[in-house]
């Protein structure tokens, strides 16, 4: 089967949640089918991953963006009645290449990873499977609640515009995949016509070991991503001081690429270390006794929680971070929102090795049973094959005009 897959960023290296899922899906589909993977590169350093990615997926198409220009285009799109996100990820180069591929090659199905990429195939007669993962429009609404005007106005407006786009896009998609039942319910609240499927994120089950004995706490993630920045600022200001008073030798590791200036500033706090980008997070997990996910803004499944559970590090999370998970608080992880109670939960685990081991063991069993990549990817592949099987005329090349992703008409007004 011939599949065209489009991702909003190069899924390599797979070190953030969206890239991990896209990379796993692309690699799996490329093993059993003829896969063309198209994506946008908006960070020049990401080009270093092209050759490594090509070893897994030989057939690549990509278009580059310069962030300042893309942001200006996004804001202009918002001002003209469209979505900032859709306009931001519009690459003329990628649009032309996708159009040529659809014109010259007989694909059986299209797989979209992230909603902005829908614009590149608008008008195709091929079946389109849309893996939205999360409802991004609601994320913008959450951002707005944490900002002051005028930024809050921009975020709130983008949330409304993107929601309008999402509702229209799912009208002609064969199936829309969400990572959690909560995200599915949210999408159907404003797009009841959507044909949906819930497929959770998977996790790499290699590298499991007992939690460390030292008083080290870890948080991982892309540290220029606003929800992560807000989470570690909240933890350092409102939670870690109480932990450090109870356990003076406690350390807090903030592990992840592109730390913002605000995050780097946290590294000046006694007991707090900001690593920046690392080649492999597993060594940092192996020296950690507890993983925290103190997010106040969160969508879908937090990969950082699944990864910690898979590696045998017990987790303390907020209810926002835990919302997309089917595991049970108290049995597989601890959930607290009040800063004082969150600190107590962390301190309790730091002091009680038996409790750490018991919680980690139950959590590992849960992810083995519910989040293995093998099971997740089989379900994704089945939906793509079902879509191709229902398509009545997939033998002839399709035609999608370049304007589908590049013109003023239709590009930002679904």
Give the location of each predicted region.
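N-terminal subdomain of nucleotide-sugar transferases
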Residues: 1-61, 103-105, 406, 413-414
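Acceptor-binding helix/loop patch of EC 2.4 sugar-transfer enzymes
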Residues: 8, 67-88, 130-167, 185, ...
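Donor nucleotide-sugar binding/catalytic pocket of nucleotide-sugar-dependent glycosyltransferases
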Residues: 129-130, 137, 155-208
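Conserved catalytic-core segment of nucleotide-activated headgroup transferases in glycan assembly
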Residues: 171, 189, 193, 197-287
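Acidic donor-binding loop of glycosyltransferase active sites
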Residues: 174, 271, 286-300, 311-314
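Short hydrophobic beta-strand element within catalytic cores of glycosyltransferases
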Residues: 304-307, 314-318
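Conserved acidic donor-binding segment of nucleotide-sugar-dependent glycosyltransferases
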Residues: 333-340, 348-354
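A charged, aromatic-enriched C-terminal amphipathic alpha-helix characteristic of glycosyltransferases
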Residues: 354-384
């Amino acid at each position: 089967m011939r599949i065209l897959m489009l991702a909003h960023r190069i899924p390599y290296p797979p070190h953030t949640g969206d890239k991990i899922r896209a990379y796993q899906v692309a690699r799996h589909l490329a093993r059993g089918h003829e896969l063309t993977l198209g994506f946008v590169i908006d960070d020049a350093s990401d080009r270093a991953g092209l050759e490594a990615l090509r070893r897994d997926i030989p057939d690549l198409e990509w278009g580059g963006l310069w962030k300042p220009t893309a942001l200006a285009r996004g804001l202009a799109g918002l001002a003209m009645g469209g979505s900032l996100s859709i306009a931001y990820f519009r690459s003329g180069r990628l649009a032309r290449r996708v159009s040529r591929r659809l014109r010259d090659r007989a694909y059986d199905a299209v797989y979209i990873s992230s909603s902005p990429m829908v614009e590149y195939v608008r008008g195709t007669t091929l079946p389109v499977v849309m893996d939205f993962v999360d409802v991004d429009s609601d994320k913008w609404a959450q951002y707005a609640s944490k900002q002051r005007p005028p930024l809050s106005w921009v975020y709130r407006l983008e949330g409304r515009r993107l929601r309008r786009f999402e509702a229209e896009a799912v009208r002609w998609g064969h199936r829309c995949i969400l990572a959690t039942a909560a995200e599915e319910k949210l999408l159907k609240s404003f797009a009841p016509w959507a044909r949906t499927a819930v497929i959770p994120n998977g996790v790499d089950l290699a590298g499991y070991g007992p939690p460390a004995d030292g008083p080290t706490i870890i948080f991982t993630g892309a540290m220029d991503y606003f929800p992560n920045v807000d989470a570690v600022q909240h933890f350092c200001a409102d939670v870690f001081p109480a932990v450090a008073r109870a356990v003076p030798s406690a350390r807090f590791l903030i592990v992840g690429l592109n730390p913002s200036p605000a995050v780097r500033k946290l590294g000046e706090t006694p007991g707090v270390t900001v690593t920046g980008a690392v080649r492999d997070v597993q060594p940092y997990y192996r020296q950690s006794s507890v993983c925290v996910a103190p997010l106040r803004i969160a969508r879908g499944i937090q990969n950082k929680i699944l990864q910690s559970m898979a590696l045998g590090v017990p987790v303390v999370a907020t209810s926002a971070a835990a919302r997309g998970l089917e595991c049970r608080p108290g049995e597989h992880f601890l959930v607290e929102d009040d800063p004082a109670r969150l600190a107590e939960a962390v301190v309790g685990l730091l002091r009680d090795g038996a409790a750490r081991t018991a919680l980690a063991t139950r959590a590992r069993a849960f992810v083995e049973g519910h989040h293995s990549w093998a099971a997740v990817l089989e379900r994704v592949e089945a939906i793509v094959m079902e879509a191709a099987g229902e398509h009545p005329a997939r033998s002839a090349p399709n035609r999608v005009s370049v304007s589908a992703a590049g013109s003023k008409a239709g590009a930002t007004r679904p």
